[in-house]
């Protein structure tokens, strides 16, 4: 399970880098939630896809997300991923941190696929906002 989820997250990072948002949406549940930025949440695949397009525009179409150290906590069909997320971009004046302690929640569906249900790249930093 651990390597499978790390591979999924790497595939998501690559899809974001390549702005292949249709492929990216294959890794999200229909009712997924994405923390776009503090105070702004996208709900469902349609909103999430639009949010990623907006994020790509914000970073001048050059964002390279990678994951550092990860801890995965599994309980049945649910996994909490705690990850050091690193963002590289040509945009040097971002008002948002480029190194984050992200939290992701994945759930296994009836077909045995792991899908992201909560994508929060800000992690617990949301508490301080």
Curated annotation (Swiss-Prot):
Pfam families associated with the record: SnoaL_3
InterPro entries, per the entry: NTF2-like_dom_sf, SnoaL-like
Protein name per its UniProtKB record: Uncharacterized protein YybH
Naturally occurring in which organism (per UniProt): Bacillus subtilis (strain 168)
């Amino acid at each position: 399970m651990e390597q499978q989820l790390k591979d999924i997250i790497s595939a998501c990072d690559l899809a974001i880098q390549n702005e292949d948002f249709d492929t990216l949406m294959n890794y999200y549940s229909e009712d997924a939630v994405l923390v776009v930025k503090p105070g702004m949440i996208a709900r469902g695949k349609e909103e999430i896809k639009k949010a990623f397009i907006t994020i790509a525009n914000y970073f001048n179409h050059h964002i390279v997300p990678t994951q550092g150290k990860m801890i995965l906590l599994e309980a049945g069909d649910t996994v909490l991923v705690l990850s050091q997320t690193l963002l590289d971009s040509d945009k040097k004046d971002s008002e948002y941190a480029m190194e984050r302690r992200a939290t992701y929640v994945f759930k296994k569906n009836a077909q045995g696929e792991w899908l992201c249900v909560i994508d929060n790249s800000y992690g617990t930093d949301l508490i301080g906002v």
